[in-house]
From Swiss-Prot:
It holds the Pfam family YihI. Residues 9-23, 36-47 have a biased composition (Basic and acidic residues). Residues 59-70 have a biased composition (Polar residues). The keyword Electron transport does not apply. NCBIfam families: PRK05244.1-1. Interacts with Der. GO terms for biological process: ribosome biogenesis. This is Der GTPase-activating protein YihI. The lineage of its organism: Bacteria, Pseudomonadati, Pseudomonadota, Gammaproteobacteria, Pasteurellales. Keywords: GTPase activation, Ribosome biogenesis.
Amino acid sequence: MSRSKKTRRISDIMPARKADKKPALPISNSKKRKPTRYELDVQAREEKKKRKHKGLPTGSRNVITEQKTASAKVKKDPRVGSRKKVPLMVEFVNKPEKGQMIKPVPLEPSNHATKATVSPEVELTQLENNECLNQLLDQLEAGKVLSTQDQQFVDECLDRVHELIIELGIEDDEENNEDLLLRQFETIDINKFK
């Protein structure tokens, strides 16, 4: 047989108390009669309930801040900010606006004359000590393929080096030494060393 849980109601055990019922507040005239002890207790309980629930409801801080942020979004100053588009690339910045043209400045021919006044010896040492050129030559020796611009730069620099060598009359000592050693090797009589 299944068990059934017994339940009790409060009214079964004891009758309702006077404190559980909300009594109607009797109208007391202070002149006619003095309030009874029971009326004073009821009045004191009601005042205590009012004092107990004096504070703000829970979470009121969050509600207030949400209301403030919502009102802040609505009240936006139209003068703040600019409607002018900001260019994202440099080339757009350098373009003149409509009707505003910048006159080009003519190049002075004296700049070319100063470059020509550099002595060939100085120019040759500059080319030999050029770090960019040396790095590109190292990459070529390592077997890497250069871009077209880099290859063109290397070719121009090497051509200029050859021109300066011819102009200065510098001969490649390495090539002459190799030729001399080769001739010497070919003409050596091996029988002398026996």
